């Protein structure tokens, strides 16, 4: 018996990296998983792999910044599985110039960045929460320690995610819907390995008391715990998972 037998979970940004691990772990514990991502090719592969491994999954293409696309995600989930019990808002785009350049930033770029990294979580919640109100549910938002430690668009967006998490926890708790956030530090993913020079990685690791980068698996256990009934009295919390780094910044 798995913790999520008979339940349905949506994971956005699930075509690769952290979201892919979340989706596969949920399926491994019995959930019907909706692999939601803008990248259809990779997302379809993840869903097919879950099914090949004996799990239950479909892929649904979504642009979380678009309300109609988020609604289509919720509708497709209901049509296939009949309900929505869990949501992981993991979709994001990375990068961002320093805050001191905000006065001269390309506004279209800035708005797209924020619409995905901050507004996207709210868009998906707006589409999904009505289907949770009758019997409750749980949500995990993906934040970042960048909300406290870095001055860039990404940190600004993730600070917004933290506030959104706490605001919605207060509002949705009356419907037995819990919402928490995970704030990872530096995580070793394919995207990190291809975009970050090894010399920079070494510098990052030197600042981490536990002396290594995190992995998606380091986050997945907490994510599944927060979604599960084991965390039934936990809501509105932001969990740093960073090897102790944030307290040295």
Feature locations, PLM:
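C-terminal helical subdomain
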Residues: 181, 202-230, 234, 241-243
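Canonical Rossmann dinucleotide-binding motif of NAD(H)/NADP(H)-dependent dehydrogenases/reductases
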Residues: 2-34
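Short C-terminal tail/terminal secondary-structure segment
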Residues: 94, 98-99, 224, 235-249
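Active-site helix of classical SDR
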Residues: 125, 157-160, 165
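The beta1-alpha1 cofactor-binding region of Rossmann-like NAD(H)/NADP(H)-dependent oxidoreductases
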Residues: 40-41, 61-73, 107, 217-218
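Substrate-binding pocket helix/loop in short-chain dehydrogenase/reductase
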Residues: 98-102, 106-111, 204
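Alpha-helical segment proximal to the catalytic Tyr-Lys
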Residues: 130, 170-175, 232
């Amino acid at each position: 018996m798995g913790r999520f037998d008979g339940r349905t979970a949506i994971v956005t940004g699930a075509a690769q990296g952290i979201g892919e691990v979340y989706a596969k772990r949920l399926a491994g514990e019995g959930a019907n998983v909706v692999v939601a991502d803008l990248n259809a090719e990779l997302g379809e592969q993840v869903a097919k792999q879950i099914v090949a491994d004996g799990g239950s999954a479909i892929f649904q293409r979504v642009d979380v910044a678009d309300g109609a696309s988020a609604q289509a995600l919720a509708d497709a989930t209901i049509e296939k599985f009949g309900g929505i019990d869990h949501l992981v808002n993991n979709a994001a785009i990375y990068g961002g110039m320093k805050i001191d350049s905000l006065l001269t930033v390309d506004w279209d770029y800035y708005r797209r960045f924020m619409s995905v990294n901050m507004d996207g979580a709210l868009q998906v919640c707006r589409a999904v929460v009505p289907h949770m109100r009758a019997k409750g549910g749980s949500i995990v938002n993906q934040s970042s320690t960048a909300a406290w430690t870095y001055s860039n668009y990404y940190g600004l967006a993730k600070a917004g995610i933290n506030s959104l998490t706490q605001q919605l926890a207060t509002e949705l708790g009356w419907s037995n819907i819990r919402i928490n956030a995970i704030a990872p530090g530096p995580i070793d993913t394919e995207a990190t390995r291809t975009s970050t020079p090894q010399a920079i990685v070494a510098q990052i690791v030197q600042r981490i008391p536990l002396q290594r980068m995190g992995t998606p698996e380091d986050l997945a256990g907490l994510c599944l715990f927060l979604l599960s009934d084991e965390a039934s009295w936990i809501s509105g919390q932001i969990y740093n998972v960073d090897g102790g780094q944030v307290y040295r910044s």
